[in-house]
Amino acid sequence: MIFQFKHLNEVPMYTHTWAQNDRLALANGFVRNDLNFFKPQNYILNHQFPKNWSDPSYSTITAVEFPIHDYVPAVFMKAFGTNEPWIFHAYILLYSIIGFFFLYLLAEKICGSKVKAALVVLFAIASPIYTFYQGGFLPTIPSIANTVIALYCYALYFEGKGEKWFRWALFFFTFAALARFTFVIPYLAVLGFELIRIFRKKAKFWPNVIGVGVSFLVLFAAQFYTSRLRAKYGSDFLSELLPADNFEEMKNILTRMWDVMLYAYLSAKHYFLIFLVIILALISILIKERNTYKAFLGWWFICLFWLTGACLFWFAMTKQFYAHDYYFLDTFYLPIVLFVALCLAILPKPQWYYGEAIMALFVAYFGIVSFKETSNFQKERRVFVANDHFTGSVINFEGSDEFLTKSGVSSEDTILVIHTYGPNIPFIQMNRVGFAVEGHDTGDIDRGLSWKWDYVVFQRPYFMDDVYAIYPDILQKVESIAVNENLILCKRKTDTIPQTLMDFMNIKKTYAIVKTNFETTDSLNYIAVENDPTSANNRIGWIGENDVYGFSHGFRKEIGSDLRGRVLKVKGKFLRRNDGQISIVIAYSKGDDLAYYQTIDLSSISKLNEWTEKEFIIFLPPRQSKEYLLSFYIHNPNKNTVLLDDFEFAFYRN
């Protein structure tokens, strides 16, 4: 609750913005279709599957796995008369809390100790990646909770409390797997153990076979219905296996998971605790001082089957693990939690004086230090960097519904968005349906322009790189009719009157210009200067092999005293001597506090030993305070030699 409260009404941003916005779009779709559960829809008229957004279906209905955890928030949205995301956040968060309550009950049964059970819950809840998604939008969190509830019901059945608890376990296992089919793995693990018990004549087959049969019939029926929707309407949700193409790719993915995601899955304190309980459990077994409570031993079979199934799923979906950290929650998270509980169950109850109190202090200490690491992880995850265009799109489209309405765009008009970062992201904010075009090549953009739409919207900060650089003829196809700080609203161009790029983007007259031609005195402060070998009357700037940072500028006066965003146009010539990477860096900083950072690669847009003249338009975000300095420099980490000439920095108000 502490981590989630201040983000309770936040639209999905930062990590997996795309996936989480897709879930919010489903909830909004149910609100729009009067809560028709069997026709889930979002905002997209050209779906990702099967034709990769290239086919306009003109229907927003999309196939998706049993979207009950998108539907329930929609019911409350409809009842409260609002689509604000806090309803979705609160639903997922409350579901997770219920799951942890049952995890405590389950762990207490397995471990036979309230203190050990509390440690298991703290271990689970303090996972950095779990905490990030705990109040989010993914169905993984409710499915984790339902699986834990199912395991607790199974534990009651296992203790001999009656057949009804097995049926409740079937219900919650089915409910978990319906929303996220990956959770069929723990279901199968439990059924596998039940088969062993049946063969050993410790459980009966016939009393439960009907319940299991009905459960799988429901699961297969749901999958069949989803496949029919997919065949008829298409889908924006993955439904195929994505194994690694070869052993080398698998090894690279494992390396990335180790290097990048290891401490996202669990903190260093988690790994230490796992190591500690394994060592203590082994010692307890060797000296025969282990817990004499035997009922938990059957859980080791379930844990083994579960981990085996998770590993098999990893091989089947290796590429998704590379790009989607929440797949860890779908697979390995709960069996690891169960493994820790089982190791703790082996440990005997402390016989020394105040033993339970000392254990409770250790549990409290673990909770404090692990939550501190998790808190730092949450802060790092929630930082906006300029190359995160998914979060940038959320920011750019904020308030777009009102902007479009004031510009005369009806709520029934169809919108085209070219080069979307997460197809549903702009349409959620615009509250309108439309076409999402990837826009990676001219054919893709031409195709989108040929469809039936009323208006097209571009993101101003990304227009130059994402649209104009790929398709400069766009100025002949559409004309700008309204512009705000982040968006350009256009309609089809019906005349042949030319329009300039600056007019199209509504970038007006400059208010400050800084020129560096390496001839005047003020040009000599930033860089070494030498005579141009090709022209006796010209001097050029020079960045040597040992200059990691060169041509540095700090702009404070030029960006003005107010905190609003600015547009910076950088124009200049450069020549590079070798293949070492060079790039432009633009940043807002105050001491060591970095608020904004953007890089522009120069190596990929130039040829060796040839002068290249380029112009870049950078949309600078609002500053947090007047103390932030705008910095510009050329980054040369790989010992290149770079020549520069005739640079100009022009500032515009946004």
Segments predicted by a language model, with ranges:
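Membrane-proximal, lumen/periplasm-facing interface regions of secretory-pathway glyco-
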Residues: 13-14, 325, 358-406, 421-425, ...
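Transmembrane alpha-helix segments characteristic
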Residues: 119, 124, 168-173, 213-217, ...
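Short acidic/glycine- and proline-prone juxtamembrane loop motifs at membrane-interface regions
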Residues: 132-143
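Hydrophobic/aromatic-rich transmembrane helices and adjacent perimembrane loops
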Residues: 140, 185, 321-348
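Perimembrane helix-loop-helix junctions
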Residues: 153-161, 173, 185-217, 283-293
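Signature aromatic-anchored transmembrane alpha helix within multi-pass, membrane-resident enzymes
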Residues: 171, 212-217, 343-378
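Membrane-lumen/periplasm interface segments of specific transmembrane helices
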Residues: 207-279, 308-315
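Short periplasmic/luminal acceptor-recognition loop of GT-C membrane glycosyltransferases, typified by
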Residues: 394, 402-442, 455-460, 490
